[in-house]
A protein has these predicted regions:
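Alpha-helical transmembrane segments and their immediate juxtamembrane cytosolic regions
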Residues: 1-363
């Protein structure tokens, strides 16, 4: 994998998103967990509602760079086929898992439209816009959200509310979120500024602190926009409303900026040494970062995020499938914490082993 894709900051962010997904999915089935630690039933926003957008944002951080590298090495046709296969595979895997869920529930209810299907369709939609500049992606993503919101309010509301993650129509909104987030990431990371409007050509920088601050600043702008528009359009994860997308993009950008700049930071700067052991000249002093065990733990998870997400669904089944209420639904807090730590421990052991063996499982 390339240096961009294997950026420790992005791996840590991916890992954080997946760990939080495991937390949300496990405790969603526990009866005594308070409402603010579960998804809002419809209109409203809880801290859990931002977890899926965190992973969408993590995908957006490398989508554009990965697409451009693939174009350079494989050409446009092979690149398009590669990305179509990747995201179509997510839809297919998600459908198989959803069918298995229906089978275990003995056919009760409709087949679930899961996170993997939503990400897969969003990725396919975003692929149509990856060849455009970040500024065009920002505009296109915004237009998609506007059109989706109109269709939602006039035609799709009942269908979307009857489906998890908004069903197929909701995936259009997730796609708009991914397109906008990729535009933000490429602008700040320095891709596309050559085609930016004259007054905006100096957005990008390679300075880590400044990059982090710009993600935070961009995030706060989107948070303010989402909160303001929320007075007109309900903020709802279940509806995947435009205001939910805008607010979630903002929160995700702020969290990424904070995490990449300071989370687990022990040391920020120092002199690097060249291969012969001599100190670099003052003009070549390079900043570096050293991280503690918590952030290293997240890097393990972030190396194979999709694989660990799929795997956690099977491990979660050990606790969620038995029907005895005391075992899961009404589990004692101590038992629930033990079960959650067991799931995290198993997955961390696997994540660490894959990391140490330098195994990366891609679709």
């Amino acid at each position: 994998m390339s240096e961009v894709e294997r950026s420790p900051e992005i791996d840590r962010f991916r890992g954080l998103a997946i760990v939080l997904m495991v937390f949300a999915n496990y405790f969603a089935g526990i009866s005594w967990v308070p409402a603010w630690l579960k998804h809002a039933p419809d209109i409203g926003f809880t801290c859990i509602d931002v977890i899926a957008p965190l992973f969408i944002f993590a995908i957006a951080l490398t989508y554009g760079a990965s697409y451009r590298r693939s174009i350079a090495s494989r050409g446009r046709r092979e690149t398009a086929l590669r990305f179509v296969r990747r995201y179509a595979a997510l839809v297919g895997i998600g459908a198989i898992l959803s069918a298995g869920e229906v089978w275990f529930e003995q056919g009760q209810g409709a087949m679930n439209w899961g996170v993997l299907q939503a990400i897969g369709v969003a990725g396919l939609l975003a692929l149509c816009f990856m060849g455009f500049s970040p500024w065009i992606r920002l505009l296109a993503g915004g237009l998609i959200l506007v059109v989706y919101q109109i269709l939602l309010d006039r035609f799709w509301l009942e269908i979307v509310l009857d489906s998890s993650h908004g069903g197929f129509p909701g995936s259009i909104s997730w796609g708009g979120m991914l397109i906008i987030a990729s535009g933000i990431a490429d602008l700040i990371n320095g891709k596309g500024e050559e085609r930016a409007p004259t007054g905006c050509k100096k957005i990008a920088t390679s300075e880590p602190k400044i990059v982090a601050l710009k993600f935070i600043a961009a995030g706060l702008i989107f948070v303010a926009m989402g909160a303001a528009l929320g007075q007109l359009i309900p903020i709802s994860k279940n509806r995947v409303s435009a205001t939910y997308d805008i607010l979630s993009i903002g929160i995700s950008a702020v969290i990424y900026g904070l995490a990449s700049s300071s989370f687990g930071l022990r040391k920020w700067s120092g002199k690097m040494r060249v291969s012969d052991g001599s100190a670099m000249s003052n003009s070549k002093i390079t900043q570096y970062r050293q991280y503690g065990p918590i952030t290293q733990f997240l890097v393990w998870w972030g190396r194979n995020p999709i694989f660990l997400y799929i795997l956690h669904l099977f491990v979660l089944g050990i606790f969620a499938l038995p029907t005895a209420p005391w075992w899961y639904t009404n589990a004692h807090p101590a038992l629930a914490v033990f079960q959650f730590l067991f799931i995290v421990g198993i997955l961390t052991s696997i994540a660490r082993a894959l990391y140490q063996k330098k195994i990366i499982i891609n679709l």
